[in-house]
Amino acid sequence: YVKLLCNAFSALTVFVLQTFRHGFPYQPTAVAFDPVQRLLAIGTKTGSLRILGRPGVDSHVKHEDNVAVIQIQFLINEGALVTATTDNSVHLWNFRQKKPEIVQSVKFQKEEITCIYLPLQSKWLYVGTKNGNVYYVNIETFVISGYIINWNKAIELCRKTHPGAVVHLCENPLDHSKLLIGFETGQLVLWDLCLKKAEHRWQTPEPLTSISWHYDGKQFVCSHTDGSLTYWSTRYLDKPNSINLPHAKTNKDGKLETCKPINKVEWRHLRSGDAFVIFSGGLPHDTAGRSPSITVMQGKNITVLEMEHNVVDFVTLCENPWNFDAPSPYAVVVVLQNDLVVLDLLTPGFPLFENPYPMDLHESPVTCCSYFADCPSDLIPAFYCVGSRGSQRRTGFSEKDWPLSGGEWSPTSCSYNEIILTGHADGSVKFWDASAGSLQVLYKLKTAKVFEKNHSRSMDGSDDEPYAVQLISLCPESRKLCIAGASSYVMLFKFRKLESISETCVLEIPIFLKFNGIFFLHFPKPGADYGLPVKVRSGVQKKPPGFQPFLVCLTSVVAGKKPVQITALSINSSYGLMAYGNENGIAVIDIVQKVCVLNVGTPDLYGACDPYMRVPRSPKCANPSSCDFTSENERCRSPSNDQVEIFFFFHIIHNKLDSTSSRSRSSSMSSLENINYEAVQCLAFADSYTKNVIVFHYLLIIEYYFTGSIFRLSGGILTMSFLDCNGALIPYSYEAWKDESRDKQKTPTKLASNSRMSPPPSGSTEMACDRQFVVIVSEKQARVVALPSHNCVYRQQLVENDFVVKSEIISLKDSVCLVCYISTGRVVAHSLPSLRPLIDIDFLPLADLSFQTRKPGIVDPMLSIWGQQMFVNEDTDQIARTFCFSNRGHGLYLCSPTELQKFTVSAEFSASLAEMMGELFFPHEMPEAPKQSFFVGLFGSGVRTLNREELFGETSSGRASRSLAKHIPRSSAQIEQLGQRASTAASEVSRAHQQVLEPENFSSSAHGLMLKYKDKKWYQL
């Protein structure tokens, strides 16, 4: 019979929310610094905004549209900042609360914004445009003043050409009524704001890139596109005081070398009188192999600091926020294309500060991710212990504290541990602690060291990423780790606290090759053109503490062919088995005795139900390995000796581009050659119940088939899980880890197997515990099948014309549910085992993850549509490897090549998220402005302030034309609320539709059950 199970879930239990973002901001474009709050803001090409403070203070927000950030200006010590974007908008952000929000915006309709400038303690923002005009925006009301500086009034009347875009705006430090305007062509204008006219004009010899004032207000420096610096005086001289080409040398012809542009320059002084001139670029063109650089000029000393990546922007960190006094610089923040570095200006040699943020996530491209929530509590200390011992402390860093010390870190974290594993293209695996709002690296495992370097060639002639990690399977309790690499190998690692010296066992598993529709078994033999893509280091090797290689399974490859990709991987430490599947079949390895116990080809998996009517040709089990260093204790633990029955479940995806598969694949694709393959997409270990039987041992000679029951679903299988009779996840068995260095003197005993995730059934459930459910989820639908009757008790069509990218059965609030990420960008959740819809929310467009698309196009125009479809499908598989769901409703995905984005589907965790987020704004007193001496004030050479409200206000200057810009007062929080309301409404409509279909499905299932048992006697039931 079918027992109807109550669902503990409701729609209020599940709520999708993005939580924390970690890594380096992808494609940065601008940077700014608040010297009082000591916060750093970085804008990106995609509209993201990261605000960084002390370690643990890291906030991410994003503009509504994917528009690049041009420039950022802090409202010093006010808890706000202004951003200018490429859609010609100016946004005011408020970060006095934990989650920054847009307060107001204004979008220019007829002008293109090129630069902005906000004077200290001013509410009027200066906006320069591509047409050469300057506007004034009130950041409190976002009203544009009628005071406008037009380009034709700023230049000389005799000038016949347009001066170009405004590239720089800055006030005179001592006279705020004088505005220095820098145009792209090199035209400089000192504008008198009170008199509304140009006080003086200069023309630089080369196009202009940036300007920086001396704090005395009497001179300034300009940087140019020819790599030169020009120094100017405000004493109405038409020529520069000096022209300096810092990196130009005289060649053999007696001429100066041509140099690259100096993109930005800053002129900063210490109170002692020493001056720093800091700029980026300016190196000679003909210097081969010259790296991007930052140059620091201190007096006659010139220091060139080479960078690993292109310099995007930099900002000098100063103690003094007042620009009319010596700013006292102490550090320089340099934003590179793929890194963030901070230079110590006060230490000889200008060493770097050691970066406390996880900015090296993309040190090697991320190829796969695994997320483990609620893992054993002793795992993080163990990883950190071996990681700290294995990594030598880097030298050459500044001994001073990290200069970005703003905000307050929240010590609140989850009551359970979270670990993230990232696999990389160079074969490394990084272990991260993600328990709190921050991300800290624990340990780095380099799998490429297991192989010989001189044999790391690809058999198809390419050398691209032979060690790239494609799949990761970790048993946290036993601390056994399986890694599948790009060169068709699988590695098993065991965790040990101490260094060891041993030999790594190697198994060469035979493969299948398909010729003219017939499968042949190939073993490497003399004269055959076979080979191994990689070769394991032979002999006894010294292995550092941590995960040490224990077993490597290799697959031989035909020369000129690509290695067969590993498509599924799983390990069960309790059984002592490791299983992996590829495009040709499946292999099961006894990891205790280091032998292949099962090697089955795809035809044998079908058995008599093979739709292609092929002759099964599977290899015999390989001979036991010659590795003799297995302990006696481990041998007695071998699953070959234990009487343990294993329920093995897998799915074969046949012809990934066939019309029977998902993603609207064309049926004509099956006529293309060399694209038909069958790959094991998913496999799982599970216990079956055998206690209510009587076992008789007979020796029968029968024809043996590997196959069992076959369940066919539309689309490839993505995940499977097993539920007990009460609908709870069946506990998976594991072997507890033990410290071999501590227990090696003890008497060997058989290790006890434990279980995790839920308690074993007892009491009243004992009679019903021989029943269980298997949940099978494909790219199109989900089914719940009762075992051992194999009746489909629940089914759900997840999508029609789209497909599921990633799905997982997770535990959430003492129950389980199915969570799926759909290709339409939506996240859907269903209760188990009833598959009742819980939520259907718009989450993330799949196009936002298209940066992982690396496949080239097809030249043949007749195949362009098919080929593009094929590559999209393969890239979707790569996206699925970096998209993870975990227990407790946690999840993450690779949102850019350099960043990880965490999210949650738990409403309970979403409610407590605010407590885990750090405070960005912390009240500080504004530093007192430097006092002027009596004689400076007497002779009128002190600071001249400006009443900007009187000058730019509506009463004196009026408002600009309404057609000039559009005011947008709505905050981002309001927009987010509207989006949530729309998603909630769509979810309610979907739930109502499902409630209509549920009675029909139940009626159909009941009718089918009645027909099945209608004509059977009572003893046949």
Predicted regions and their residues:
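N-terminal alpha-helical scaffolding segments that mark the starts
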Residues: 1-50, 59-62, 85
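Short coil/turn segments within WD40 beta-propeller repeats
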Residues: 46-49, 87-90, 131-134, 185-188, ...
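Per-blade loop-tip surfaces of WD-repeat and WD-like beta-propellers in eukaryotic adaptors/scaffolds
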Residues: 6-17, 51-61, 89-105, 131-163, ...
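Extended amphipathic alpha-helical scaffold segments
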Residues: 299-302, 306, 316-320, 327, ...
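Surface-exposed loop and turn segments in beta-propeller and other repeat-based domains
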Residues: 148-160, 243-258, 310, 357-397, ...
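Intrinsically disordered, low-complexity regions in large eukaryotic scaffold subunits
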Residues: 319-322, 342, 363-376, 382, ...
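Canonical WD40 repeat/beta-propeller blade segments in eukaryotic WD-repeat proteins
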Residues: 23-32, 67-74, 110-118, 155-172, ...
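Structural hallmark of WD40 beta-propellers
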Residues: 37-41, 59, 78-82, 102, ...
